[in-house]
């Protein structure tokens, strides 16, 4: 780690803390040459591989925008959407890899959204699962009711 003051290549860690549910590590460092102190932030990368093969960084904001469309006209707060996005990210990171496919992201959204708002869940599921008929909706509603009664 190069010192931002004198560009010396060595520093020592004075303090280390995890933040943002353990996904980020903040380290307080001190240069071994000039004794200047600085902070580094280390964040693990979570990549999403899309259906067309393109890979991009996981974005909670993008996830929230997508779920917000399903919640349009519903009484779902921005804070609730942020918590949902955080829960989805925790679930995806718990899978252990640094790369997930977009299908995994959609699957991770379904259960927390079902708990948050039933109508928004059906809207999201209809797009995510590519419903093409009323039978698709009926089947999903039947499965939904079965899970709800458990």
From Swiss-Prot:
Domain of life: Bacteria
GO MF terms held by the record: ATP binding; DNA binding; zinc ion binding
Mapped zinc finger ranges (unnamed): 3-34
Cofactor binding notes: Binds 1 zinc ion.
Cofactor (UniProt): Zn(2+)
PROSITE patterns: ATP_CONE (PS51161)
Domain ATP-cone: 46-136
TM segment ranges: none
Record carries keyword Glycosyltransferase: no
One protein family per Pfam: ATP-cone
Keyword Transcription regulation applies: yes
GO biological process: negative regulation of DNA-templated transcription
Keywords, alphabetical: ATP-binding, DNA-binding, Metal-binding, Nucleotide-binding, Repressor, Transcription, Transcription regulation, Zinc, Zinc-finger
NCBIfam families linked: transcriptional regulator NrdR
Function per UniProt: Negatively regulates transcription of bacterial ribonucleotide reductase nrd genes and operons by binding to NrdR-boxes.
Family note: Belongs to the NrdR family.
Protein name per UniProt: Transcriptional repressor NrdR
Originating organism: Corynebacterium kroppenstedtii (strain DSM 44385 / JCM 11950 / CIP 105744 / CCUG 35717)
Upper lineage: Bacteria, Bacillati, Actinomycetota, Actinomycetes, Mycobacteriales
Gene that this sequence comes from: nrdR
């Amino acid at each position: 780690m190069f010192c931002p003051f004198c560009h010396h290549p060595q520093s020592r860690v004075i303090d280390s803390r995890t933040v943002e549910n353990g996904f980020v590590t903040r380290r307080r460092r001190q240069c071994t040459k000039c004794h200047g102190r600085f902070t580094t932030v280390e964040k693990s990368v979570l990549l999403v591989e899309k259906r067309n093969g393109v890979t991009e960084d996981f974005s909670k904001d993008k996830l929230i925008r997508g779920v917000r469309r399903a919640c349009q006209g519903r009484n779902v707060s921005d804070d609730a959407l942020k918590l949902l996005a955080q829960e989805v990210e925790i679930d995806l990171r718990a899978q252990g890899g640094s790369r997930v496919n977009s299908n995994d992201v959609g699957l991770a959204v379904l259960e927390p959204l079902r708990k948050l708002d039933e109508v928004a869940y059906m809207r999201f599921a209809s797009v995510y699962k590519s419903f093409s008929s009323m039978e698709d909706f009926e089947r999903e509603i039947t499965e939904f009711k079965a899970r709800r009664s458990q």
